[in-house]
Amino acid sequence: MQIFVKTLTGKTITLEVEPSDTIENVKAKIQDKEGIPPDQQRLIFAGKQLEDGRTLSDYNIQKESTLHLVLRLRGGAKKRKKKNYSTPKKIKHKKKKVKLAVLRFYKVDENGKIHRLRRECTGEQCGAGVFMAVMEDRHYCGKCHSTMVFKDDDRP
């Protein structure tokens, strides 16, 4: 029976084969016609690569079927050189977790009454949780830049 082999260049080769011929035999016939070594050939039929040990009938290749010939690629990507660093890697900063850190903002007197050591900002954009810095004669918010001046009886 006659089959066709289409190469990458678009050239079509006709081969006389039998259904019992192996893929190796077909590759040998292609080598005779084109001069391409069988170890570099890959034959594809119906989207599947044909394995050397099997026959044409295993793949249901009938008369006037077309096989596609592609060449096997050797090797892989270009190897990259490993970078050599002259200085050791920087150690990342680890944040230290302080247990009960919120206690810095409050003081408990001998009667058990809780006093806030810092004042929360009353600005519109700050809200609860933003504390003001204690200066000598005032409280100052670093976020919204508002300032509250102490009265004589209001000093901490």
From Swiss-Prot:
Keyword annotations: Cytoplasm, Isopeptide bond, Metal-binding, Nucleus, Ribonucleoprotein, Ribosomal protein, Ubl conjugation, Zinc, Zinc-finger
Cross-link named Glycyl lysine isopeptide (Lys-Gly) (interchain with G-Cter in ubiquitin), sites: 48
Pfam families: Ribosomal_S27, ubiquitin
InterPro entries noted in UniProt: Ribosomal_eS31, Ribosomal_eS31_euk-type_sf, Ribosomal_zn-bd, Ubiquitin-like_dom, Ubiquitin-like_domsf, Ubiquitin_CS, Ubiquitin_dom, Ubiquitin_ubiquitin-like
Annotated ranges, domain Ubiquitin-like: 1-76
Gene Ontology MF terms in the entry: structural constituent of ribosome; zinc ion binding
GO cellular component: cytoplasm; nucleus; ribonucleoprotein complex; ribosome
C4-type zinc finger segments: 121-144
Keyword Transmembrane appears in the UniProt entry: no
Signal peptide span: none
Any one GO BP annotation for this protein: translation
Feature type site, description Interacts with activating enzyme: 54, 72
Annotated site location: Essential for function: 68
SMART domains linked to this entry: Ribosomal_S27, UBQ
Covalent cross-link (Glycyl lysine isopeptide (Gly-Lys) (interchain with K-? in acceptor proteins)), residues: 76
Note: Ubiquitin is synthesized as a polyubiquitin precursor with exact head to tail repeats, the number of repeats differs between species. In some species there is a final amino-acid after the last repeat. Some ubiquitin genes contain a single copy of ubiquitin fused to a ribosomal protein (either eL40 or eS31).
Family per record: In the N-terminal section; belongs to the ubiquitin family. In the C-terminal section; belongs to the eukaryotic ribosomal protein eS31 family.
Name of the protein in its database record: Ubiquitin-ribosomal protein eS31 fusion protein
